[in-house]
Amino acid sequence: MHSFSAVFVVAAPARKVWQVLHPPAPRDAPLPRVLEYPGGSMEILNEGDEAGQGLVRTCVFGVPRYLMSGGTARSWEVVTEAKINKLSRYVAISKPLWSRAEGYHELDEQSDGTTLLTFHETYHAHNPVLRALFEGRVHEKISADNTVIYEHALRYAGATKRVS
């Protein structure tokens, strides 16, 4: 199993950071609805509650081409815990390297009005041979891409800097 953590400081209150990461669905939005982002897409199958708990999605994202999947992967994900302006936790199953990921982002508003966002994810390939051969490199690519996506998105809330 591999894990990855990143902490960002965002020059915005937690409420604004949350709004950027969890925009409400438009009233007339069909289900499923698709959101495009740099390097992939997310298809929302169920919106979940007002905090996003229960949200069900599939994601398409990049993986190393040597996995012979055309450089793309797909995950099936559910948000298992969510607290508005605080926390979103998910579980995912993905392919082509059949794996399970669990992760969260947590917001911690600071006294100076900035917000610390902590992103953490664990990744585990089920097949022991594929795990030994590919898990570390695949998770490294996914983690690097997630960092870029977070940095890109968080800039819509305010100036952003990765601090760990």
Per-region residue spans from a language model:
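Hydrophobic/aromatic beta-strand elements that line small-molecule binding cavities or substrate pockets
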Residues: 6-8, 74-81, 92-94, 102-109, ...
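Intrinsic-disorder/low-complexity, polar/charged segments enriched in Ser/Thr/Lys/Arg/Asp/Glu/Gln
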Residues: 1-9, 56, 74, 87, ...
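Glycine-rich portal/gate segments that line the openings of hydrophobic small-molecule binding cavities
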Residues: 28, 39-96, 148-164
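Amphipathic hydrophobic-ligand
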Residues: 97-102, 143
